[in-house]
């Protein structure tokens, strides 16, 4: 690179302003870097409060350049570089009387103690930097402000470098080890926000250190979360041992069910014990029932009075009153039939309303409708078939012959309901019905007048 000398500005009177159209660019008309030009202002106030006229001989205020980019003096930079001092980049937006920022060293604190992390040295001094017209300011900022902070990447740490101009703070990779050792510490921002998210492996290691020794298993699983679930072979062997122990002690499957009710308050039927021994229950249900049967085996071997307790429980169960069979009167049954013809599968609110009108229990009404639907299925009634919980309305047709060529059969519908459309009711879903076109002169019953 080379230093460029701008064309000297013209001097005008106090009341005139320089015309930028008259400025020349050193005789160069190419598309290269333009020379910085300046405007002359009439009256400016200096930093010390004295006023002067620009363009005159007694003007004490220099001409303000229009080039917003920083430019370096090559000779001064080379002298500073030979003396060991890094080049200092002047800021175009700050005056010469700006306040120098004091160098401060921020120590990382973690619960009042120094961080065990080693201090990272700064990289070597950078070479000369010449900004171009199409580039902005360098990535380090001179005299950074609180609003101009640099957020580090997850694998970077903020390093306070005292050798760069303006005590700049810049991100440095965590795995970098430059040759020049300089006293530098990490910023407090890292300790408060970035220390826990430095790397995903660090979070795993931190979580692993919190687990006590002996609880970590292969694959990162803990032994506390893993319950002892028996395998299918173990469950099959236990069922065989249970049956052998029960037969050898002289207990029946019903006795085992009664014994579980006496000992643990949970009575099981003979069918459940039989299905467990024949491995006909689901594996989940067998796992839930196995602990009770294991305790029963131990109790049957050690307790001699268990058989007496079982016999007493059987007597109590036989003397316990059973629920009487529900008998519905013929009038009530006819009313339920009429409701069933209107809606074969009523909802919960409809069942409650029917139960209130008939002065019956809701469960009785629910069971009656369920039995009535099953009866219709057994009889093969297509009008009562259910498709996804929906039933078809039932319409009774009278067999009277039609009168005239265009007469239709009379349809008798329940009170308060509209008559069913004159279409062919197929066995498909209710929404899948397609109307059938009827030729003129043909009745719905297939009779031609």
Swiss-Prot record:
Signal peptide: none
SUPFAM superfamilies: Homeodomain-like, lambda repressor-like DNA-binding domains
Region (Disordered): 79-125, 170-233
Low complexity composition-biased segments: 187-199
Biological process, per Gene Ontology: anterior/posterior axis specification; cell differentiation; gastrulation; gastrulation with mouth forming second; head development; negative regulation of activin receptor signaling pathway; negative regulation of BMP signaling pathway; negative regulation of DNA-templated transcription
Keywords for this protein: Activator, Developmental protein, Differentiation, DNA-binding, Homeobox, Nucleus, Transcription, Transcription regulation
Organs and tissues of expression: Highly enriched within the animal half of developing embryos within ectodermal and mesodermal regions. Expressed in the neuroectoderm at the early neurula stage, with expression initially extending to the future hindbrain/midbrain boundary, but later shifting toward the posterior pole where it persists within the tip of the tail in hatching embryos. Expressed at very low levels in the adult kidney.
Domain POU-specific: 227-301
Comp. bias (Acidic residues): 224-233
Keyword Nucleotide-binding in annotation: no
Gene3D superfamilies: Homeodomain-like, lambda repressor-like DNA-binding domains
Keyword Transcription regulation: yes
DNA-binding region: 321-380
Cellular localization per UniProt: Nucleus
Pfam families given in the database record: Homeodomain, Pou
GO molecular-function terms, A-Z: DNA-binding transcription factor activity, RNA polymerase II-specific; DNA-binding transcription factor binding; RNA polymerase II cis-regulatory region sequence-specific DNA binding; sequence-specific DNA binding; SMAD binding; transcription cis-regulatory region binding
GO cellular component, one term: transcription regulator complex
Residue ranges, compositional bias (Basic and acidic residues): 97-110
Function of the molecule: Transcription factor that binds to the octamer motif (5'-ATTTGCAT-3'). Activates transcription when directly bound to the octamer DNA sequence, but can form repression complexes with other proteins at the promoter site to inhibit transcription. Binds to the promoter of the vent2-B gene to activate transcription when in the presence of other BMP signaling factors also bound to the promoter. Inhibits the competence of ectodermal cells to respond to BMP during embryogenesis thereby inhibiting epidermal differentiation and promoting neural induction.
Name this protein carries in UniProt: POU domain, class 5, transcription factor 1.1
Lineage: Eukaryota, Metazoa, Chordata, Craniata, Vertebrata
GN (gene name): pou5f1.1
């Amino acid at each position: 690179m080379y230093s460029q000398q701008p064309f000297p500005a013209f001097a005008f009177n106090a009341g005139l302003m320089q015309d930028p159209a008259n400025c020349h660019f050193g005789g160069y008309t190419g598309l290269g870097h333009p020379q910085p030009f300046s405007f002359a202002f009439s009256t400016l106030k200096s930093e010390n409060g004295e006023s002067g006229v620009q363009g005159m001989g007694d003007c004490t205020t220099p001409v303000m350049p229009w080039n917003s980019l920083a430019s370096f003096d090559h000779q001064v930079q080379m002298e500073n570089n030979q003396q060991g001092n890094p080049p200092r980049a002047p800021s175009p937006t700050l005056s010469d009387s700006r306040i120098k920022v004091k160098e401060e060293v921020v120590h990382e604190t973690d619960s009042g103690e120094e961080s065990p992390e080693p201090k990272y040295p700064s990289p070597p001094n950078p070479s000369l930097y010449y900004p171009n017209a199409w580039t902005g300011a360098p990535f380090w900022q001179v005299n950074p402000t609180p609003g101009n902070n640099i957020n580090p990447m997850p694998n970077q740490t903020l390093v306070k470098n005292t050798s760069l101009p303006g005590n700049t703070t810049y991100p440095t990779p965590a795995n970098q080890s430059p040759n020049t050792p300089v006293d530098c510490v990490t910023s407090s921002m890292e300790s408060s926000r970035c220390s826990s998210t430095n790397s995903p492996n660090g979070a795993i290691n931190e979580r692993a250190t919190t687990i006590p020794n002996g609880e970590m298993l292969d694959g990162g699983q803990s032994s506390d979360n893993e319950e002892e679930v028996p395998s299918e072979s173990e469950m099959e062997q236990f069922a065989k041992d249970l049956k052998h122990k029960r037969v050898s002690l002289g207990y029946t499957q019903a006795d085992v069910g009664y014994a579980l009710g006496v000992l643990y308050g949970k009575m099981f039927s003979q069918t459940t014990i039989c299905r467990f021994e024949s491995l006909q229950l689901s594996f989940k249900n067998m796992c839930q029932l196995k602990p009770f049967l294991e305790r029963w085996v131990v109790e049957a071997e050690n307790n001699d009075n268990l058989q007496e307790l079982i016999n007493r429980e059987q007597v109590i169960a036989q003397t316990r009153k059973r629920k009487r069979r529900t008998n519905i009167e013929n009038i009530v049954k006819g009313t339920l039939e009429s409701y069933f013809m209107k809606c074969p599968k009523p909802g919960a609110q409809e069942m409650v309303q029917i139960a209130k009108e008939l002065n019956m229990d809701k469960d009785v009404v629910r069971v009656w409708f369920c039995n009535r639907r099953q009866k219709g299925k057994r009889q093969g009634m297509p009008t009562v078939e259910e498709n996804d919980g929906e039933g078809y309305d039932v319409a009774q047709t009278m067999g009277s012959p039609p009168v005239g060529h265009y007469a239709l059969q009379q349809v008798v519908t329940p009170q308060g309901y509209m008559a069913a459309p004159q279409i062919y009711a197929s066995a498909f879903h209710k929404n899948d019905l397609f109307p059938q076109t009827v030729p003129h002169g043909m009745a719905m019953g297939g009779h031609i007048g």
